[in-house]
Amino acid sequence: MYKKLKLTTISELIKNIYCSLSVLIIGCASAYAVEFNKDLIEAEDRENVNLSQFETDGQLPVGKYSLNALINNKRTPIHLDLQWVLIDNQTAVCLTPEQLTLLGFTDEIIEVAQQNLIDGCYPIEKEKQITTYLDKGKMQLSISAPQAWLKYKDANWTPPELWDHGIAGAFLDYNLYASHYAPHQGDNSQNISSYGQAGVNLGAWRLRTDYQYDQSFNNGKSQANNLDFPRIYLFRPIPAINAKLTIGQYDTESSIFDSFHFSGVSLKSDENMLPPDLRGYAPQITGVAQTNAKVTVSQNNRIIYQENVPPGPFAITNLFNTLQGQLDVKVEEEDGQVTQWQVASNSIPYLTRKGQIRYTTAMGKPTSVGGDSLQQPFFWTGEFSWGWLNNVSLYGGSVLTNRDYQSLAAGVGFNLNSLGSLSFDVTRSDAQLHNQDKETGYSYRANYSKRFESTGSQLTFAGYRFSDKNFVTMNEYINDTNHYTNYQNEKESYIVTFNQYLESLRLNTYVSLARNTYWDASSNVNYSLSLSRDFDIGPSKNVSTSLTFSRINWEEDNQDQLYLNISIPWGTSRTLSYGMQRNQDNKISHTASWYDSSDRNNSWSVSASGDNDEFKDMKASLRASYQHNTENGRLYLSGTSQRDSYYSLNASWNGSFTATRHGAAFHDYSGSADSRFMIDADGAEDIPLNNKRAVTNRYGIGVIPSVSSYITTSLSVDTRNLPENVDIENSVITTTLTEGAIGYAKLDTRKGYQIMGVIRLADGSHPPLGISVKDKTIHKELGLVADGGFVYLNGIQDDSKLTLRWGDKSCFIQPPNSSNLTTGTVILPCISQN
């Protein structure tokens, strides 16, 4: 079998050929055309040379060509079919008004172009301030234009004209969990659960459904199972008004009012469609797990986030910034113990840039999760924020029904510059609860946020709210109307967070405090204090220590926890740790653990934990965990055993599956709010994509997950690790996808073997230098003829038929079969077709 030449050798060969050509050029680099001095070519027949395709700089023959385009050094995520026309005996690129619009030129420039069209397009270099450069090797056109002639000034944002809604397709994003708990005495228990999202895309429309499934067993016998579809909805972006339209079962999205589940229609301005601005706020959820635990964050009984965490402090920092209202947090320990509390996800001061308006509106009927209709009236809700002055925003909203509930709110937000930012609003409710008279109530809310640049401190006083006894939220009205009596009439609530990093001490401090009081129930206060510091001990660098104290108050029960941890790096990918924990019973336990992530796709840990008596009696809990990352998903396994007490096993797998008319593939997990991109490698298997985040399957299909929306993203092929006998021409793809899109691109893949040979004509001579060798079957160029007929051909199939054309002459080559190839240079007879 003929061995594939190394890419470095190929690159050097090509570079040497083109470097040789470059020294033949006579004239300055800025000239529009050059000639090659054939006398400088060391060839037996200098006249037998055809370099016409190298003789013009920045020009192509008259015609239409598909190219990549750069505007002011920024790559556009589309290919353009650009036309070259003849002007003053030279060819020049010519753009249609539609192409100028796609590239972001202003209406004034487009109007000038429309008045000076040539064959339906405008030669843009007629404008002296516009210059172009054509890279023929990459077929890439660079355009330089004054920034004032472009609509969009932010180089990090892509205009709507270049957004890609993707292709039609379907997907399933899934998370699977399984657990087995076996006490030394008593019944065994098992649990299987799953949650995720399924979707279908058609044009700009996206159909989505959330699902969550849970089944419990006792000694292998099914005890209970539950399958819910919390939301089924249709949505699409509307770029013309920078908004998102949603139809179906959804949750209201509000920075003023509590969120509730409904069936209907909503329209919300999407700030991600705008140049960078305030991006909202999402809370950080912290806690301490006593064992291997499952942390679940939900809202309105819909799972938002779920993760397995090891014993010790944990922090969830990657919640979506669209979350508003109360979030329910549940920590399920492996021994069955459950801890619950609530976290308020309130927005920071509601500020909008001067002259801009942000809004959201919805109408329909409230429903329970799963879609069951409630005894509720039709409602309409809406809110807005308007940038009145440079540092002042006005905002407000309302919730209106056709029966016994109305609510109005108004507020103002201030950017106080060096003093931080502040907002204040008042909400009025008019409601008639069951068997009560109609009452009017008021709620007052304030938010404050300040970052102290000189000290690196961040203070957030989010969501201070005081409500009088007669104030009723929409959620409380829904519960009362449907005779749900387990809700509490909130009186006062607030959240305070403070973060400080002292660089000189390498010390970080984090404090959070949340307090809720009620008119008809006892109050609860949750707070946590965390101190962490890095330092060096002899040869051990970046030893980290942390001390965490937290109190969780839930249903008149206080749970205090204190946790101390020391982690010592062992090389670059291993860690030895010790932890000490005191729980609400004042029992102190110790944990020693070892973590190894030396393999980027495989990590594991072992630990032993227990109190002094358990270690003394050899009854400490022994734990082990293993995580395996693949291109198709992530596997997590863990187990715990305690002598004469219990053992438990846990497993989880998350991944995704995407299918389109071009093919289908399993791939790594892609979040429901993210887009994804399908790569078609024309049947080539094991093509590494985006630093091996994905690979193509046996059908040549790969999917890159979690591609950001409304942001220009470059996706790449790892050309250094291509399979044998495969080369990729377009190894970098640039795209800007809309929310939830399935992007698609087909790679220019050359599959087949390589030949290093010498082309010989019937009379013993060679074809001219610079002639292209093309595969007649697939219409692709496979190489260029060098001096003495030497050629490197790449991507040859057993049925390939190669052709060469120069002037009025042509010939064809029947390459040797791959099974008959030998190492070294191959003689390739080229049979004349004249």
Per-range role (PLM):
Residues 69, 285-287, 676-681, 753-761:
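A short, amphipathic beta-strand motif
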Residues 60-83, 293, 683-693, 762-777:
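Short, ordered, surface-exposed loop/turn motifs in non-cytosolic proteins
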Residues 162-164, 192-204, 226-239, 376-398, ...:
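Feature captures outer-membrane beta-barrel proteins of Gram-negative bacteria and organelles
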Residues 81, 692-701, 778-790:
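Short, acidic Ser/Thr/Gly-rich low-complexity loop/linker segments typical of extracellular
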Residues 86-95, 317-324, 701-727, 738-739, ...:
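Short Pro-Gly-centered beta-turn/loop motif in secreted/extracellular proteins
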Residues 95, 162-219, 357-430, 453, ...:
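Conserved, compact domain cores that house catalytic/ligand-binding motifs in diverse enzymes
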Residues 149, 178-182, 204, 213-217, ...:
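Transmembrane beta-strands of outer-membrane beta-barrel pores
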Residues 23, 27, 31-279, 584-658:
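Post-signal-peptide, soluble extracytosolic/periplasmic N-terminal scaffold domains
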